[in-house]
């Protein structure tokens, strides 16, 4: 077991705690309305007697979308920090998992595509975290679309990769868990997108709830990589960073420890 096992758990714990903290700050600073509020008005008049605490009068501008929660300071500062640090951790997890599969002689187009989608997800998170929706709407929406779509593709591809590599009952149980998480992610992302396109306050609020479920679901999925990361070594990162054509392979008579790859053609699994 290595310290790398803490990386996926840290990503999940840090990000989930962070975005809920951002939400709590936004509610207390009256920048969004609570998720339990389903009543929205066309407009609200300022009430001088209403000091602190959640809003009692809400408009569509107060729907608690995750991005909306991180629009205004001070919560926007924490939101950007979460986006940037989360992106680095996501990219590192994707790279390590890619290298780990290469060590297992599982160099396939699915593994390569999963790496690309994971890194694309990380890039989208950087854009989302640093370009707030009220100040750079187009860039923020592009970043959100890229991050969410790439994140969904990443979890689906890794469901396939893990299922085909499962050998024990515990592996199969983890494969089923990840499949359930992938299905939940797909359903909530589709519903969030459909609801968001409508101007109905109820559907907009539903879009916000689906978005929260989607993001939490994806973060939990990333956390499950701790199951595999106990076997990661320093050679894993080397395997991931080596270019494909010149990847060194360990022969039976060689003392090289650059990778754990087996070069026998018949041992290379294509999925």
Swiss-Prot record:
**Transmembrane residue ranges:** 3-23, 76-96, 109-129, 141-161, 179-199, 212-232
Main localization (coarse): membrane
Its GO biological process annotations read: phosphatidylinositol phosphate biosynthetic process; protein localization to plasma membrane
- Identify the residue ranges that face the Extracellular compartment according to the record: 24-75, 130-140, 200-211
Mapped to this chain, the residue ranges on the Cytoplasmic side of the membrane are 1-2, 97-108, 162-178, 233-271
Entry keyword NAD: no
Fetch the InterPro entries from UniProt: DRAM/TMEM150_Autophagy_Mod, Frag1/DRAM/Sfk1
Question: In the UniProt record, which residues carry a glycan?
Answer: 37, 41
Q: Where, per UniProt, does this protein localize?
A: Cell membrane
Which keywords describe this protein according to UniProt? Cell membrane, Glycoprotein, Membrane, Transmembrane, Transmembrane helix
Q: Name one GO cellular component term.
A: plasma membrane
Q: How does it sit in the membrane?
A: Multi-pass membrane protein
> In UniProt terms, what function does this protein have?
Regulates localization of phosphatidylinositol 4-kinase (PI4K) to the plasma membrane, possibly by reducing the association of TTC7 (TTC7A or TTC7B) with the PI4K complex. Acts as a regulator of phosphatidylinositol 4-phosphate (PtdIns(4)P) synthesis. May also play a role in fasting-induced catabolism.
Family from the record:
Belongs to the DRAM/TMEM150 family.
Q: How does it assemble?
A: Interacts (via C-terminal cytoplasmic tail) with PI4KA.
Q: What is this protein called?
A: Transmembrane protein 150A
